[in-house]
Amino acid sequence: MALLPDKEKLLRNFLRCANWEEKYLYIIELGQRLPELRDEDRSSQNSIQGCQSQVWIVMRQNAQGIIKLQGDSDAAIVKGLIAVVFILYDQMTPQDIVNFDVRPWFEKMALTQHLTPSRSQGLEAMIRAIRAKAAALS
């Protein structure tokens, strides 16, 4: 995930944005930095239910036990939200993911207050799916 900032830099960059238009543009930019998802990974088993947009998230565990996440969406802002979630879970084991609460980070970013209800529900669906997949691996 060298193309994406770490958690602290994400928060700093987000807080530097002057208004919500800039913040949305930053979220979209983060989504554009995600590596391309292979066509074969755009399957029903990787599809996230509960999102209005199409969302696919792939979870793989490397030899050191660290989770590698890949994902995509057909909506630019949602793809950016996927990138934000991936940044928060970067370099974690399955157990780390299960134990890590992303909500304080979203509160620091004031993210959930500025998303539409359907996007907030989709974001929650992504987090639930990632945590469930991680729990199955831990």
Swiss-Prot record:
Active-site positions, per UniProt? C51 (cysteine persulfide intermediate)
Q: Which residues form the signal peptide?
A: none
Q: Which Pfam families match?
A: SufE (PF02657)
Keywords annotated in UniProt: Cytoplasm
Query: Which coarse location class applies to the principal site listed for this UniProt protein?
Result: cytoplasm
> Where does the UniProt annotation locate this protein?
Cytoplasm
Q: Which NCBIfam families match?
A: PRK09296.1
Function, in words: Participates in cysteine desulfuration mediated by SufS. Cysteine desulfuration mobilizes sulfur from L-cysteine to yield L-alanine and constitutes an essential step in sulfur metabolism for biosynthesis of a variety of sulfur-containing biomolecules. Functions as a sulfur acceptor for SufS, by mediating the direct transfer of the sulfur atom from the S-sulfanylcysteine of SufS, an intermediate product of cysteine desulfuration process.
Q: Which family does it belong to?
A: Belongs to the SufE family.
Query: What is the protein's name according to its record?
Result: Cysteine desulfuration protein SufE
Q: Which organism is it from?
A: Escherichia coli O17:K52:H18 (strain UMN026 / ExPEC)
Tell me what gene encodes this. Answer: sufE
